[in-house]
Amino acid sequence: MVRCSISGASVLPSDTQVGRQLILVINLRKKIEEISIDDAVDVINNIKNTYIEKRISKYPQKDERVLDKDYVFLPLQVPDDPVSKLSKINSRELLEAAIKISKEQKVLLLIKRHPLDNSDFLSEVLDSVKDEPFVKITNGNVIDLVKNARSVIAVNSGVSLEALYLGASVWNSGTSEWWGAVNKISCLSDIQKAFEKDQPEMLSYQKNCSLFWLEIFGLGTMMLRNLCTKGG
């Protein structure tokens, strides 16, 4: 099972189940749009403040403080992550493209290795950039890494969902249950947008989608659950 870093949240374990949830979002689009944007913002802000203040995360985190500011954060996934198949751009392509753009644009890229990924390829790539001034490997706390980031890029890592609730500009190349809430990477050139200084604000529908998944994961309020049980 692929799990999000937020305590209490988990992503469904198979491609089939993810597909069902994507269909659910499509079918509930009208109801998602009916959610009060003020309510969505209030709930998300409350969670954001709680998790930033207490530095809560699903997995144990090392208390390694992040001193850098205004960087692009790339949390890596395990190569055999089943949900990563739901992307035209795999983790390797995303990593290599992000490193290239970081060096060209001289924008700091912080990469956090997944604790279960011991692949030779990743070790070689990370070893090759250890002396690059604009590429750093970090073991910092996920909450701190997201909070101080210009943007967060991933295939469809569960950290992306956490980043949405922490107010980050999130860019994904792979579909997921929260696909409607993120900025899309449809081709490698789109990755450059995540390195731009000015990041797009979340649209109302994106915020409502975020609240939708808070409800599904039991982290929000009963508001959406009540809305979905109404007639129509």
For the regions a language model picked out, list residue spans one by one.
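Generic beta-sheet signal
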Residues: 1-4, 112, 155, 173-175
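Short beta-alpha junction loops
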Residues: 7, 113-117, 176-178
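Leloir-type glycosyltransferase catalytic cores
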Residues: 8-69, 181-232
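Short loop/turn segments at strand-loop or loop-helix junctions that form parts
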Residues: 69-81, 113-114, 175
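Structural motif
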Residues: 71, 108, 150-151
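Mid-to-C-terminal functional-domain signal that highlights helix-capping/loop sites
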Residues: 84-94
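Catalytic donor nucleotide-activated moiety binding site of glycosyltransferases and closely related
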Residues: 96-137
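A donor-sugar binding/catalytic signature common to diverse glycosyltransferases
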Residues: 139-185
